[in-house]
Amino acid sequence: MISEYVDEEIKRREDYSLRRLKGIPNDRRLWILTCMDERVHVEEALGIRPEDAHIYRNAGGIVTDDAIRSASLTTNFFGTKEIIVITHTDCGMIRFTGDEVAKYFLDKGVKVNELQIDPLLPSLRLQSTEDFTKWFKFFRDLGANSPDDIALKNAEILKNHPLIPKNVTISAYVYEVETHKLRKPHQRLYELTSRFEHGTVVKE
């Protein structure tokens, strides 16, 4: 009956609008950490809808203190059971270092060794130029040479963090801006194809 369909749609819209008040988790119980780069089309790559996941973006898709804050809230209080970390190719965070950025701001007269990093927590201050360079978390400063390395490092940090429940599934992927597809870290499709062509069987 039409009335049943209308009633169902009304309830669906109500649940969507009031899901936090009703304690309803996102549809896939999923939290995604990825880069703010507009070329990373997360929903398309994963085949999900906006209501399926909480998506957290920052420069580089890096695990930061605020990323951990958000991840801990969604997994402990919003019913999230899975975390997916997505970095991407051609990321600007691999092109620079914290030292280069520190010099840029120092040349502008900014005292990078005296910065208050959280307006609500005045005691949290960067007390040296070295602190400032580490705070930006450029890939090379983290000992990573590729988005693949960062994806794996991010996943490992989250898996071992005391604020993230141990029963949460955590996975890492790399989004290729050239193909708009996801792949596992260090497993480029053309490399796998080349191994098969040369008679090498790939085992996971």
Curated annotation (Swiss-Prot):
GO molecular function: carbonate dehydratase activity; hydrolase activity; zinc ion binding
Taxonomic lineage of the native organism: Archaea, Thermoproteota, Thermoprotei, Sulfolobales, Sulfolobaceae
Role, per record: Catalyzes the conversion of carbon disulfide into hydrogen sulfide and carbon dioxide, with carbonyl sulfide as an intermediate. Likely plays a key role in sulfur metabolism in S.solfataricus. Does not show carbonic anhydrase activity (hydration of CO(2) to carbonate).
InterPro entries cross-referenced by the UniProt entry: Carbonic_anhydrase (IPR001765), Carbonic_anhydrase_sf (IPR036874)
Quaternary structure, from the entry: Forms a hexadecameric catenane homooligomer, through interactions of two interlocked octameric rings.
Protein keywords: Hydrolase, Metal-binding, Zinc
This protein's record includes keyword Hydrolase: yes
Enzyme Commission number(s) of this protein: 3.13.1.5
Residues the entry annotates as binding Zn(2+): 35, 88, 91
Matching CDD domains: beta_CA_cladeD
Name of the protein in its database record: Carbon disulfide hydrolase
Top-rank EC class of the record's enzyme: hydrolase
GO biological process, one term: hydrogen sulfide biosynthetic process
Pathway per the UniProt entry: Sulfur metabolism; hydrogen sulfide biosynthesis
Domain of life: Archaea
Disulphide bond pairs: none
Cofactor note: Binds 1 zinc ion per subunit.
Catalyzed reaction equations: carbon disulfide + 2 H2O = 2 hydrogen sulfide + CO2 + 2 H(+)
UniProt xrefs under SMART domains: Pro_CA (SM00947)
Required co-factors: Zn(2+)
Family: Belongs to the beta-class carbonic anhydrase family.
